[in-house]
Amino acid sequence: MALLQISEPGQSPDPHQRRVAIGIDLGTTHSLVAAVRNGVAECLPDAQGRVLLPSVVRYLGGGGRQIGYEAAAAQMQDPANTVSSVKRFMGRGLGDITGREKLPYNFIAATDSGGMLSLSTAAGVKSPVEVSAEILATLRYRAEDSFDSDLYGAVITVPAYFDDAQRQATKDAAHLAGLNLLRLINEPTAAAIAYGLDNGAEGVYAVYDLGGGTFDISVLRLAQGVFEVIATGGDSALGGDDYDAALAEWVMQQTGVRASTPEDKTAVRLAARACKEALTATDNVAFTADVAGATVQFDVKREDFAAVTADLTQRSLAAVRRTLRDAQIERDEVKGVVLVGGSTRMPVVRTAVAEFFGREPLTNLNPDEVVAIGAAIQANQLAGNDAAGDLLLLDVIPLSLGIETMGGLVERIIGRNETIPTAKAQDFTTYKDGQTALAIHVVQGERDLVQDCRSLARFELRGIPPMAAGAARIRVTFTVDADGLLSVAAREQASGVEARIDVKPSYGLTDEQIARMLQEGFATAQQDMQTRALVEARVDADRLLIATQSALDVDGDVLTAAERTAIDDLMHALRATLETSTDAAAVEAAAQALAKGTEAFAAQRMNRGIRQALAGKNVSAL
């Protein structure tokens, strides 16, 4: 009798059959697809041998569309229907798009409050998810043609600073493109995979990732196949596009020319990008653009470009400083700096990074391709093709997650820079006697007060059995999956009643909000501690007043008139302190006075309870 065979978990049942899995770098300016072929990760070219796909989609009347190079070539004559840098709009509301008046698109605000924006095109209204799906589908077809096979799945990279809404929008785009999404991974992590495996690197590394629309800085520890992200930071609205815009605005100021039409704005922006790219190889370039029916020409020196964009470069270095502080790493402990993203080709950026870290950055892998290559390596392993692979990814979440407690305080469940995937639980209880429902308010941020953090979601746990205040035990569990998406569950331990929610906020944080939340978290730490102490003292005092009044209502008759008056006076004093004082110590002192003043009353209540329990019983019965 033949023995039945059982395959290893996660591996292909047929040892000779390889699943085709791809890695996709869905970029702001360009996108790429890569795969492992014959043991080597490589970017897949199109029929013309080009590995880069411009992240541009042009919509035509009658439902037609152009994607990639053909669409990019049409930006000048049809800017309103040619969508580029759509990554900046993923998971965003209309109010989040800074400088949208300079863009040639007809934006449409969401019908629901805080929803994701859309764009009006010749082919109808299109969401950023739909536009991104067109790009992903094009890369999918390229990979299928390259392997002449269906795909098992894909790993797609996202900026480390993408929040829940932006990550969910990316997942939706992958689904719309017909891709089986194996994992979302952070772009710096993908770059570290490529460098770690190709070069056998170990130690602490910084990944400086400046793309077309986003900037990420990650500090990683690489050791024996384990890639641990110690800390992440960045700016979700800083990239090569901003360097283009700064140069274009400066040239317009110098020449006195105004770009007012969508066509003129697009012409100036494309000319600025061409000028920026040319300055990578030469010290002096002529800026040339047709604006308002005339040709604008202006000589731009490399030092001019450096001066005009100095604020942008310093913004990136400020994020680097914050992230190193989070990681508790000094600059001289960083063994190497990996440059990722086409924008790191700019000499002004390379020079600034080298001066900051005191060492030349690593550039031996193509900065345009390194993220896609790392994603392909991870996809190959998730598909079960690399049985010997022992790669372990330890990504982190960028901002703390918690819930609101009494007094508007934030109780953190998962701290920022916590390794994901992760699940953490904490027990809470009710505030009032007979409370049968609990409102769960999920927030994100580094401050101690709910009003200073960002609201993510609200839900209710109902059906809690009526109990005395503090008797119920409600376990709240936060789960963050490998893609960085959050789900929250609340369960009352005695009855088993449970409620849960997948947190999918309608749109994401702006770059200003991200920077403010982190900076204020550091700048106001002492103030937050004092405020938290006051709020906690107030909550405890309120709870003591409620409990004391409840006890008086039930057993107040055991007190003499003088004893009752003394307790009433102490309660009045505590209420007066709560109304007038902002000193936590004063509130605590008044509460302690009431607690001490009711000790005899508590003993009398206990004696009464014992007498009632023993009434009518003899010693033998006991």
From Swiss-Prot:
Instruction: List cystine links.
Output: none
GO biological process, any = iron-sulfur cluster assembly
SUPFAM superfamilies listed in its UniProt record: Actin-like ATPase domain (SSF53067), Heat shock protein 70kD (HSP70), C-terminal subdomain (SSF100934), Heat shock protein 70kD (HSP70), peptide-binding domain (SSF100920)
Q: Which InterPro entries match?
A: ATPase_NBD, Heat_shock_70_CS, HSP70_C_sf, HSP70_peptide-bd_sf, Hsp_70_fam, ISC_FeS_clus_asmbl_HscA
Molecular-function annotations in GO: ATP binding; ATP hydrolysis activity; ATP-dependent protein folding chaperone; unfolded protein binding
> Which species?
Acidovorax sp. (strain JS42)
Function field: Chaperone involved in the maturation of iron-sulfur cluster-containing proteins. Has a low intrinsic ATPase activity which is markedly stimulated by HscB.
Q: What is this protein called?
A: Chaperone protein HscA homolog
Alphabetical UniProt keywords: ATP-binding, Chaperone, Nucleotide-binding
Family per record = Belongs to the heat shock protein 70 family.
The record's section on NCBIfam families has:
HscA, PRK05183.1
Identify the gene encoding this protein: hscA
Q: Which Gene3D superfamilies match?
A: 1.20.1270.10, 3.30.420.40, Actin, Chain A, domain 4, Substrate Binding Domain Of DNAk, Chain A, domain 1
